[in-house]
Amino acid sequence: MGPPKNFKHFSKSNKHKKEQKALITQEDFYLAAIDCEEQADRWLLSDIKKCLRFYLKALEHYENGLTALDSTQEGKYNIYYNETRLFLQIYTDYLANNGYINILQYVKMDDMPDLSNLVLSLPQIIQRFEIVYETFPEQRTWDLQFNLLTCYLTLIESLDDTVSPTVAMEGADILTLTNKYIEIFQHLVNYLLQELQNWSENAEQDSDDTDTELQRDTLDEDAMQVTRDGSGIRTNGPVQPPAEVMDVSEQVTPSSLTEVLANSLKFNHALMELVIESKISIEKNVETKILNPIQINFLEDTTNKFYLQLRDIIDSISAAIPLDLKEIGLAKTLIEGLNIISSGTFESLQDFVLQTVSFTDLLDEKDVQGKIDLSLIRVDIVEFAILCLNDYSSDASWKLSGLLTKVLTEARTLLTDYRNQILFLKNQTLNEQLSHVVFQLCDVLVNSSDNELRRYAIKESTEKSQKTPGGAHTLNILMKNANVFLNNAVAISSKQCGLQETIIDKLKRNYIHNQAKERLLFLQRLEQKSNEDDGTSASPTAMTFDMPPEHPFYSHYR
């Protein structure tokens, strides 16, 4: 759901851009590695192989820097941290893009045998971050803690049943990880709050100093020129270079705290999903459960307390610190939806996802992306409610799939309108969003097709036991809708998204294109087989796409 997670890294100011020279000291290798990473980023628009080769070169420089001359603890920390952050970036961008897409499968890498050096599993990356965290207590930065928490969140989300789990964890490991997360979170938030207090005081002091200088009326000609271009007023005394000021001022801002709080709400949400899934597994199939009853009770109590703590923090500081309440509100909406799934009724869930009155007040009328994000959250909530059902052919399943149709329709409309707006206006800033919007739209179209086939399977099951007037006609409409959605997804995803589309985004678009195309071919083979009497047509059971979990239509042909 949504764009990939952010992660923090050390920036490099202009003073570091030195002419090429022999690499001798630890700092030489460190700066050369950072430069290679920047070179890699420049190739994102055109050549993924060159991009990855620069990442490999950066990794080589980091490794050489660990044994270079003039080694210091600070230098080792910078290298260990940045090297591990690079592994996380590769994992997030290439191995688990959007949380689950391995885009490297679409790239021929025969001439890059050493690419495996860049590829680590998420548990391996976490282990490296934890080693850095424990080995360098004096050098720890908030960036390290942020990325470690991001890894914990990604790991818990990877256990979600809605996609094929990439990592297996025992219940005891989940409890241990939860305790680690909360402990680091509390330390990090305390640090950020202290830094933001200093940040706020410095901002007020800068404002006071500016007012004082204005009152003196002693500005020289150069200062007046600076004033006219809106960039501020020069004050007397030594001034830091702009790059240095930029590094310091960007270290901690209100958006830093917003990200930590929003990610922690998402972490709490992921744990709540695990609790619900484990309860269902005990009822359905005890062998598939992740948590035992004792662990479920402990984690349920922990998530309730953590959520209350998060809400208290947000409520107590939001008046003093300009948090992004929209991002926080989106995460809270997910949790509120889960609470209704756990203890509410269909009617209460329907009212919540179709209205979400508690959140819409935070959205600006012109905030198209905010409306899209909210609509996709509604989709996630209803899809999870469907997964929680014990009987896919029940009346509850039919009602929920009908509700899912409504929220998917809203999401399709918003995304289609936004895509058309981008294509019509031809604005460079908007053009950069085109590929992301196309991926989201095609993903929703594929989900819409899957839902129509879910409704088809439910209707077909009830038709076998009780014939209803117009039942066959309804089945034909549902199957036709499923095909139309897939045809639209194939057509839209096959179109280029302009010069601003990165190679990664192109490969994501290729992924969703293949998902739609293979589903469409599968349905066409099904229809062909049903129309032939001799049964000689190819079997439609070979599924080369990612099948939705426990899907009543596709699982019949598994």
From Swiss-Prot:
Residue ranges, annotated region (Disordered): 531-558
Protein name from the UniProt record: Uncharacterized protein YNL193W
Top-level division of the source organism's lineage: Eukaryota
